[in-house]
């Protein structure tokens, strides 16, 4: 018996179900491909394409069985035998509450559990409709337990696996031999665990719903062994050749780079400018020179601590010499008289070779020269050439002015970098190149006439004995070696695809489970929902998930793959494999588990092991708080909509 009078509710339900599927795609799909995008093995576009294929396939093949729990496992549907309209309104309310909270979480870049969201929303409408006796409260107890069990168990599993990989492969001077030996094991484990997960879930369309557990385990082990043999005899030799070819190319590029640098240094034209105060007269001049020997001498003078030569404005250049109008070694800058005892070197560069060599020498001088760092204020110059980032990285080249007056305003975008007594600012700053700094100082001397400022370079003010920073060693571990990257590259893509397939089967029920219930109630005229889930509804949910992924999925993918902690192919593979194994084991022994919580726990655990300072604990705190409020917030949204439908709309329809 078709309930024609409630057709409007079915139409509204289909619209809201698509929005709910959209929100699931925007948030939950990051579980599968967030780490793969973060490690760089796939681009965001490639991840969206792969996820669209595997999410849709998984939702169609695996989604029917999981949807049964969402439809019947949270509330007692028998209590709605005489109030079918209330149950239909409740399913609509559940979809609204779940969709709203997941969209809010996606906007905030917080990964939350779609399962917990729909469970909370279902409990919310049931409390409004028939009170507390219609809720399966043990489901809620399991959800609360999963907040702690999921990340802890998955984190321990991921941490143990990553420590093994780190000890036996990553820490080795040559990681290739051990990596190739472990490759068949990794592939076998990946294939075996994910095949077991798919078979254990059961796919009604494939006739796997009645497969016994022992047969599932035996078949999974057999498939894993077959893949291990294929990898050992075919993939490993190919991978060995590929790694050797990559290392050979890198070595050749390194030699070419060194030869090019030597050639560039021989061809470089050096220009030494007459600096005010060097000889004490207006006619002091220094001829231009183009010899590579002079360039080398000038470069050496920077690094060996020889006499510093002041630099000023070049008013004219005659017969190959640069003439300076200033004789007393001072010039005006920003309304202050500047004592120009600054050492500078200005090179006209055809390429970056000599320039980089000079900056390295400055860096060495900065470390070796024993000078106390005075109190400093800072002036940031404009950015006008391509060497900015390199300069800042090597020697921190902003101009430092020792203003004695405290009323000099600091630029908004300035950043303090040099000296133990100087506080550090986190604001973004743009630095100029070394040669452009020289030009800017020269131009500044004609801007004013009086004052009292002494100009210093960052290289002269640096602490001669900089403290050793342990983070430097940790930064070296942020990226895998090229050969390690190749070893784990395809493995991580494989685990992400399997995870996406399983996720599509599991989480499509979160999106269209209430819609399936709504449709079956409308079609059959009763609450028991005896028919199986229509395939076209599963496909409808899969399309909605893909739409959400393409439009908004990048937000939570960035949180999972980049913001929480840096990800590499080796750590990403560990996270994917360990979290998948945790979900399979915990589900089989009856422990409450959440895929999202497992993935976040693995990301944090592996990130903490790789680098103590790499984990964004503030972000993790926010994610955990989002988990904590997911059930009550989704329930409140759902309860509000249910109250409107039950008391404001249904009595008048």
Curated annotation (Swiss-Prot):
Keywords: Cell membrane, Glycoprotein, Ion transport, Membrane, Phosphate transport, Receptor, Sodium, Sodium transport, Symport, Transmembrane, Transmembrane helix, Transport. The keyword Hydrolase does not apply. GO terms for biological process: phosphate ion transport. It is a multi-pass membrane protein. One of its GO terms (molecular function) is sodium:phosphate symporter activity. Glycans are attached at residue 81. InterPro entries: Phos_transporter. Residues 23-46, 108-109, 164-187, 239-483, 554-572, 611-622 are cytoplasmic. Sodium-phosphate symporter which preferentially transports the monovalent form of phosphate with a stoichiometry of two sodium ions per phosphate ion. Belongs to the inorganic phosphate transporter (PiT) (TC 2.A.20) family. This is Sodium-dependent phosphate transporter 2. It comes from Xenopus tropicalis (Western clawed frog).
